[in-house]
Design a protein with these regions (language model features):
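Beta1/beta-strand and adjacent pyrophosphate-binding region of the FAD-binding site
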Residues: 1-12, 157-167
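N-terminal Rossmann-like dinucleotide/flavin-binding domain of flavoprotein oxidoreductases
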Residues: 2-4, 35, 42-117, 197-220, ...
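Beta1-alpha1 glycine-rich phosphate/pyrophosphate-binding loop at the start
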Residues: 6, 11-77, 176-196, 401
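Flexible, glycine-rich terminal cap/loop adjacent to redox cofactors
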Residues: 9-37, 42, 49, 53, ...
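Rossmann-like dinucleotide-binding cores of NAD(P)H-dependent redox enzymes
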Residues: 40, 73-80, 152-153, 158-162, ...
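Glycine-rich dinucleotide-binding loop and its adjacent helix/turn
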Residues: 48, 125-183, 187, 215-216, ...
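A Rossmann-like FAD-binding core segment of flavoenzymes
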Residues: 93-96, 100-111, 118, 181-278
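FAD-site-proximal beta/loop scaffold in flavoenzymes
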Residues: 140-157, 240-317
């Protein structure tokens, strides 16, 4: 049995950053990842990096096969870099294998050449999330059905792509494949498109997708999936639909299966997410959980912040917690991207605040004209009494950069007038925040 001060299960953003930090302070660390193809974590290998690389090339009407080759090169470079960032440290052992708990201090690791047992003073779980597959007849047995990981491995572009689920993952793939030239159909079971966004924002997104040729079918109750003449057939009460490939984009769930958490006294919620407190401590006193596996917001930057919280608890004053996050922005990398921080208009009004709303069409922004992309709208919700920004939605080119400016102002508890009167360079998309907040009176 090998003894470590820290055992880290999962090579994700929080896990790999914590491993390097602890090792550099003298801890003996082992990080366990069940597949060498996942060194570096979900984001680098099957998430943010490969998808955004393809989005970038699709926006430039690049060749699909060439884009796929570039995607592989980008991923391989970053995976190798991440591996050596840890493996080259003297007191870090990178172990390929599947881990399960024997007790709250001991792991059994199954490797290609046998088993080994590791013991750790402290253990950190960073196993991420996995695709949630709905119970639809034939969905898991029909050729041509993929989750996002499988679709990212295609060598040839499908002429027709069906997407099961109209959420944020589905949006990115729909926009990307449409830009590559694929006929895309989104099958959304709900009666409303993007219910987490304001209706006007959701409608603007729908129009942009439809202009790309994307078909959006709401109330699409897919009852069965099967193979039909070399294609994938989706059966609904309204009739059958044929596609060449089907993406299952119905969400992701915490990856806790097989960890044998009960042996360590680690509790999970009804969705399998590991229950943690504000400091990411589990129900076992020497075990922490970080990132998507807790069932919270599934963003790489949240996983990174989880690392900061755990680091502060181990090496600092222990005051940092999840309560310090304030306003968490997000971006959906469709074309153009959607970015939001804070409340929607509907949420703000429901809170009882007296609000004023400003909207600005992207067509009114000079930089958008320069970049020849005038699609979308900017929207701000402000509390009239406090002059504080309650929320902002940006559907426009470069919104993924702009939203971080808004978050900074909101976190600093500054009035909206800071953005209204801020000096920005010209011509830029950021200066449109001047115009947007000038509409608040």
């Amino acid at each position: 049995m090998t003894q470590y001060q820290a055992l880290i299960i999962g090579f994700g953003k929080a896990g790999k950053t914590l491993a390097a930090t602890l090792a550099k302070t003298g801890w003996r660390v082992a990080i366990i990842e069940q597949s060498a193809s996942m060194f570096g974590g979900t984001c680098i290998n099957i998430g943010c990096i490969p998808t955004k690389t393809l989005v970038h090339d699709a926006e430039r009407e690049g060749d699909f096969s060439v884009a796929m080759q570039r995607k592989v090169a980008v991923v391989n470079f970053l995976r190798d870099k991440n591996f050596h960032n840890l493996a080259d440290l003297d007191n870090v052992d990178v172990i390929e294998g599947r881990a399960e708990f024997i007790d709250n201090h001991t792991l059994r690791v199954f490797q290609a050449d046998g088993e080994r047992v590791l013991r750790g003073e402290k253990i950190f779980i960073n196993t991420g999330a996995e695709s949630a597959i709905p119970a639809i007849t034939g969905l898991t047995t029909t050729a041509g059905v993929f989750d996002s990981t499988g679709l990212l491995s295609l060598s040839q572009r499908p002429a027709r792509l069906g997407i099961l689920g109209g959420g944020y993952i589905g949006l990115e793939f729909a926009s990307m494949f449409a830009n590559f030239g694929t006929k895309v159909t989104i099958f959304e079971a709900a009666p409303q498109f993007l219910p987490r966004e304001d209706w006007d924002i959701a409608q603007a997104i729908a129009r942009i997708l439809q202009e790309k040729g994307v078909e959006l079918i709401l109330n699409a109750s897919v009852q069965a999936v099967s193979s039909q003449e070399g294609a994938v057939q989706l059966e609904t009460p309204e009739g059958a639909h044929l596609v060449d490939a089907l993406l299952v984009a119905s969400g992701r769930k915490p990856a806790t299966t097989g960890l044998q958490l009960q042996n360590a006294g680690v509790a999970v919620n009804e969705r399998g997410g590991i229950i943690v407190d504000d400091y990411l401590r589990t129900t076992a006193e020497n075990i922490w959980a970080m990132g998507d596996v807790t069932g919270g917001l599934q963003f790489t930057y949240i996983s990174l912040d989880d690392f900061r919280i755990v680091r502060d608890g181990l090496l600092g004053d222990g005051k940092r917690s999840t309560r310090d996050r304030q306003n968490v922005p997000y971006s959906v990398f469709m074309t153009p991207p959607l970015s939001r921080v804070g409340l929607t208009e509907e949420q703000a009004r429901a809170s009882g605040a007296t609000v004023q709303v400003a909207t600005l069409p992207v067509a009114a922004i000079p930089r958008a004209r320069v970049m020849d992309d005038t699609r979308g709208v900017l929207k701000a919700v402000v509390d009239v009494n406090t002059q504080r920004i309650l929320g902002v939605s940006l559907l426009c080119v470069d919104s993924h950069e702009m939203i971080n400016i808004v978050k900074t102002v909101m976190d600093a508890d500054l009035p909206y007038t800071v953005l209204r009167d801020q000096i920005f360079t010209h011509p830029t998309m950021s200066e449109s925040l001047n115009d947007l907040f000038s509409l608040i009176k």
